Amino acid sequence: MSVEDGGMPGLARPKQARWTLMLFLSTAMYGAHAPFLALCHVDGRVPFRPSSAVLLTELTKLLLCAFSLLVGWQTWPQGTPPWRQAAPFALSALLYGANNNLVIYLQRYMDPSTYQVLSNLKIGSTALLYCLCLGHRLSARQGLALLLLMAAGACYASGGFQEPGNTLPGPRSAAGARPMPLHITPLGLLLLILYCLISGLSSVYTELIMKRQRLPLALQNLFLYTFGVILNLGLYAGSGPGPGFLEGFSGWAVLVVLNQAVNGLLMSAVMKHGSSITRLFIVSCSLVVNAVLSAVLLQLQLTATFFLAALLIGLAVCLYYGSP
């Protein structure tokens, strides 16, 4: 299994086992984010400022990276790396920041179900940029696997759950509220295309600079999250009046922040030693974890559409990673 396939060539079996464990752990943590966030809701809304949670997540990543550097400083190569190598990570942080904010603005121009279905186009944009920017070629078998991933995401988003007692699958709505009709405006479509392109570009660009630089991953993360903290601090300061910095935080909110921070570090290892395609499979496979936790913690019922999505994901994994 090659690096691009999500494995580590030439590694001894214990190291390969640790790599596989890391992939499973990242998948589980990615899938747990939405259910944990739902458990934070009070009266149907998030009681804290989202910008506070994002800033705390970036700060946690930065502190974990700094601690890792302090612990392993004796194993570093001699000499101080030139700080100009930090500059490329400013663009990476900017792309991630733009992507996160576009998600918020997209909700104004389309309904949530339309967004969930169409946002799976980022799988195609990531694969296209992966081939164009990194010079990799995907076989017809691998291309079909990625198409199956897109179809699985669309199936899952279009009706993987239903509320107990509800005969039709679909997104939950407030009691007594009329369901929002499916819609998307021309501006919303343009923003969605931009979102998918930026999502793919941020992933591929980060992979490119991480693999080109011969620097420890912890130092690269330090560069990335330093810029991330600066950017999100500015976004928080400019977000206008609202709850205080830690107002509304609960134990579940702290768990959301820690989960996102640790998973961000795991994802950076995937980008350094794996590939953007590996990341796509982690995100897609996390739908299964998301569904199981939503059923257990939120009492949502799985529908036949979910099992179809899970089947498509399994087929995609077999096609992409299996022997021809």
Curated annotation (Swiss-Prot):
Chief place where the protein resides: Golgi
Stretches assigned to the Lumenal side: 40-52, 107-142, 202-214, 272-279
Gene Ontology biological-process annotations: positive regulation of cellular respiration; positive regulation of translation in response to stress; transmembrane transport
Catalytic activity: CDP-L-ribitol(in) + CDP(out) = CDP-L-ribitol(out) + CDP(in)
Any GO CC annotation of this UniProt entry: Golgi apparatus
Transmembrane annotation, as ranges: 19-39, 53-73, 86-106, 143-163, 181-201, 215-235, 249-271, 280-300
Ranges per topology, Cytoplasmic: 1-18, 74-85, 164-180, 236-248, 301-324
Topology within the bilayer: Multi-pass membrane protein
UniProt superkingdom: Eukaryota
Similarity section: Belongs to the nucleotide-sugar transporter family. SLC35A subfamily.
Role this protein plays: Mediates the transport of CDP-ribitol. Does not exhibit CMP-sialic acid, UDP-galactose and UDP-N-acetylglucosamine transport activity.
Name under which the protein is recorded: Probable UDP-sugar transporter protein SLC35A4
